[in-house]
């Protein structure tokens, strides 16, 4: 029987040699073998579809009797390789064959992998949950006997080998005569061995049931081909191993999959960039509005949030990481926090980043612990040793971590990511393990305010409720509000309804939709000829899907092209220009020195030295979007605009009850007067006190303005509004207030050149007077002495206002103090 089995293997080996030697036909696999030899690889990937066309009987036998067929195919490959390159065949003891293509009903999931597939070749898809350490497995040991001076060798096989009879695993220590043997480790042959565990994809698991898993055995060149969290497609032979309990073999068996090919289904592995793609990206980068086009193409199904999309684009592009000669690391990763009301598409923006970024790890605040985000110390089941398991942020090294429900995390777990967000590494010192792991990732987090919804009558710090040490590590913090506006609501509702009405053009009438469609399904049966098709640059316009939110001439980049553009743009390393450096330094010093001069504006996060690095990173990301080698002043201004939008938030005052009309009776006036006198002065608006002339009780008549529907709750300009013009903003002013409002107008704008001349003349007046303070009237008359172009009253008022804002002078009771 053994002779017949060996003869059968030799017969089918000749058929496989004929399949590989196809130079007279198309020469596909003859060329693949030559490429394998040139790359010094040990594994040839064969498409099952090609084998079905040329030799259907062997293809059927390969799927049903995997062990013998793979053994014969491997020998045939070595035989054919020895004819092409004899030296290469002698160098490698074994050559391996991997398979891909369509496996029909043998394309299964871990749940459907039952005993009927034992001995068959199957294709399994799943998510890698656990990866063991790589350990050497002995293939052939060489032993030397000092007494007889003879050398003997022994081969080892186990149940994971394709040989029929497994050998013992013990090393020989004595020969037949009882002489001691010495193992020659340098002459012995070992192979790498690793085990994986893949779990059923959650979208393919039946409703209400937990996903199942299967163990995978990888040898030689298949080790370290994937990491935990990867979606993989593994082809291999399904085999059972006997289970032992107490030294006896039980009736139940343990099943494993002996892998021969591992394909990654993640976005990063399938990113094939050609020379044409690079030229197309460079051509597109020459457009003046490339940054707006890229940001508009981010999550086009979400209406609005233009600044948030620009920030997410900067996060995907990133800054330039610097390692100084003394070892100091300046991070280039950009961190963004989205906080705001429910139903403003925060989680949907995170979901889009997961589909766009080359490497992105999703997690939630409540479902993640501190060690789950960084690293955990576990016990190896095989050896019992303590080992490290990487967390989400370590797995997302050089990628993005998306944390939803960030406010639901406990303070202890939230503190664990402080080191990662700034230093880009995780330091572990526990259970006798001292290690430092790289976690150079960007963090995109979404959270709800402390009160569930954003309270506009409280400061941003009170609404956010996070520590300053954590907030300063976020480069940008956006407050996203659900503002009631009939026009905007109408546009959003029209946009959402059109998306729900949309149907795929390829969908037939009455065709049932698949329940478990996923990104991996679309790649399961893709042939190699279809993978290299050109990527569409723009999305096709659909009147039903896009509707009023997008005109026909407006263009949106496709998701596939966005991935390629971001990947190419991240290779650029722009350098800061002198003008950009000066603009960034001036803006940072202004942010540090400026207090909240407006009574209704507060900062969303503290201004620290990290803010300066934020401006640099955002400027660099904007330059990368243009694929520029240098950071210009336009890039710096774009970064400043983003920071201005994200750092300041308007705070509204509580509505005060207005006084009743005077003809309603004196009793009502007295009651109102008592109520106003009992009100704390701290609750009184500064704007109200400034707008009133005297200390008359009519100051209570003035109500703060209601929030405008079109107001984006952001400070639109860098210069704050002067206190004198506040009365113009009051709603429904009385006749007395109208007189105040008409008499006080906004100061005239003064140019920078005239402002510098005014500063020089003012310094001269203070030097001549040898005083630290001068009356404003004296300055007004003396400032124009000897001047060829006298300053107007409006220019003087504007200059004093500008210098007061810059903390250069202080005005009190019409006296100017020099700071």
Curated annotation (Swiss-Prot):
Residues 290-496 form the MCM domain. A motif (Arginine finger) lies at residues 472-475. It is an enzyme of class 3 (hydrolase). Residues 655-717 are annotated as: Disordered. One of its GO terms (molecular function) is helicase activity. Its main location: nucleus. It is found in: Nucleus; Chromosome. Pfam families: MCM, MCM_lid, MCM_N, MCM_OB, WH_MCM3_C. Acts as a component of the Mcm2-7 complex (Mcm complex) (Mcm complex) which is the putative replicative helicase essential for 'once per cell cycle' DNA replication initiation and elongation in eukaryotic cells. Core component of CDC45-MCM-GINS (CMG) helicase, the molecular machine that unwinds template DNA during replication, and around which the replisome is built. Belongs to the MCM family. This is DNA replication licensing factor Mcm3. It comes from Drosophila melanogaster (Fruit fly). The gene is Mcm3.
């Amino acid at each position: 029987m053994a002779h017949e089995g060996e003869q059968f293997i030799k017969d089918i080996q000749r058929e496989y040699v004929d399949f590989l030697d196809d130079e007279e036909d198309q020469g596909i696999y003859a060329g693949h073998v030559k490429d394998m030899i040139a790359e010094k690889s040990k594994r040839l990937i064969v498409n099952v579809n090609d084998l079905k066309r040329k030799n259907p009987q062997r293809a059927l036998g390969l799927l049903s009797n995997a062990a013998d067929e793979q053994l014969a195919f491997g020998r045939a490959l070595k035989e054919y390789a020895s004819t092409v390159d004899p030296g290469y065949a002698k160098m490698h003891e074994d050559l391996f064959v991997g398979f891909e293509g369509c496996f029909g009903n043998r394309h299964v999931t871990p749940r459907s992998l039952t005993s009927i597939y034992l001995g068959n070749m199957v294709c399994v898809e799943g998510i890698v949950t656990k990866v063991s350490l790589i350990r050497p497995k002995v293939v052939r040991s060489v032993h030397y006997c000092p007494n007889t001076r003879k050398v003997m060798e022994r081969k080892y096989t186990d149940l994971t080998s394709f040989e029929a009879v497994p050998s013992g695993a013990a090393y020989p220590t004595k020969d037949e005569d009882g002489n001691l043997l010495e193992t020659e480790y340098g002459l012995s042959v070992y192979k790498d061995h690793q085990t994986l565990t893949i779990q059923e994809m959650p979208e393919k698991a039946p409703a209400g049931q937990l996903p199942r898993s299967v163990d995978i055995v990888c040898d030689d060149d298949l080790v370290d081909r994937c990491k935990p969290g990867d979606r993989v497609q593994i082809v291999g032979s399904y085999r059972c191993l006997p289970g032992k309990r107490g030294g006896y073999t039980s009736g139940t068996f343990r099943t494993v999959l002996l892998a021969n090919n591992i394909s990654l289904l993640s976005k990063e592995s399938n990113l094939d960039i050609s020379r044409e793609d690079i030229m197309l990206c460079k051509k597109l980068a020459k457009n003046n509005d490339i940054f707006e086009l890229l940001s508009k193409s981010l999550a086009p199904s979400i209406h609005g949030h233009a600044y948030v999309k620009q920030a997410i684009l900067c996060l995907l592009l990133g800054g330039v990481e610097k390692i100084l000669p003394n070892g100091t690391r300046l991070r280039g990763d950009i961190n963004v926090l989205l906080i705001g009301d429910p139903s403003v598409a925060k989680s949907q923006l995170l979901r889009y980043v997961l589909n766009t970024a080359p490497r992105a790890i999703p997690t939630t605040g409540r479902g993640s612990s501190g060690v789950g985000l960084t690293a955990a110390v576990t016990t190896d089941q095989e050896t019992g040793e303590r080992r490290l398991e990487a967390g989400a942020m370590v797995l997302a090294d050089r990628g993005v971590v998306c944390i939803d429900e960030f406010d639901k995390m406990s303070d202890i777990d939230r503190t664990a990511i402080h080191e990662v967000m700034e230093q880009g590494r995780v330091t572990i010192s526990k259970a006798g393990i001292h290690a430092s792991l790289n976690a150079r990732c960007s963090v995109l987090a979404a959270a709800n305010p402390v009160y569930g919804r954003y309270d506009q009558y409280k400061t941003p710090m009170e609404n956010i409720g996070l520590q300053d040490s954590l907030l300063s590590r976020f480069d940008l913090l956006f407050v996203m509000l659900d503002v009631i506006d009939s026009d905007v609501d109408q546009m959003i509702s029209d946009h959402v309804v059109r998306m729900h009405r949309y149907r795929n053009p390829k969908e037939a009438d009455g065709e049932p939709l698949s329940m478990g469609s996923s990104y991996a399904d679309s790649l399961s049966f893709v042939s190699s000829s279809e993978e290299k098709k050109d990527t569409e640059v723009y999305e096709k316009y659909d009147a039903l899907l896009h509707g009023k939110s997008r005109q026909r001439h407006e263009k949106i980049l496709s998701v596939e092209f966005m991935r390629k553009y971001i990947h190419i743009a991240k290779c650029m390393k722009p350098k800061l220009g002198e003008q950009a450096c000066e603009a960034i330094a001036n803006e940072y010093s202004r942010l540090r020195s400026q207090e909240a001069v407006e009574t209704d504006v507060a900062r969303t996060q503290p201004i620290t030295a990290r803010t300066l690095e934020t401006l640099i990173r955002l400027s660099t990301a904007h330059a990368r979007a243009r694929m520029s080698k240098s950071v210009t002043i336009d890039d710096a201004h774009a970064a400043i605009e983003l920071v201005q939008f994200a750092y300041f938030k308007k705070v509204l005052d509580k509505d005060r009850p207005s006084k009743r009309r005077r003809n309603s009776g004196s009793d009502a006036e007295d009651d109102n007067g008592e109520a106003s006198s009992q009100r704390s002065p701290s609750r009184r608006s500064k704007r109200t006190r400034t707008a009133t002339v005297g200390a008359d009780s009519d100051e209570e008549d003035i109500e703060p303005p209601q929030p405008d529907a079109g107001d984006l709750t952001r400070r639109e300009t860098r210069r704050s509004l002067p206190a004198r013009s506040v009365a113009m903003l009051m709603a429904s002013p009385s006749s007395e207030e109208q007189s105040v409002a008409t008499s006080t107008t906004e100061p005239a704008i003064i140019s920078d050149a005239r402002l510098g001349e005014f500063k020089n003349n003012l310094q001269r007046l203070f030097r001549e007077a040898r005083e630290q303070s001068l009356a404003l009237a004296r300055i007004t008359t003396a400032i124009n002495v000897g001047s060829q172009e006298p300053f107007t009253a409006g220019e003087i008022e504007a200059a004093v206002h500008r210098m007061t804002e810059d903390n250069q002078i202080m005005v009190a009771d019409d006296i100017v103090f020099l700071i």
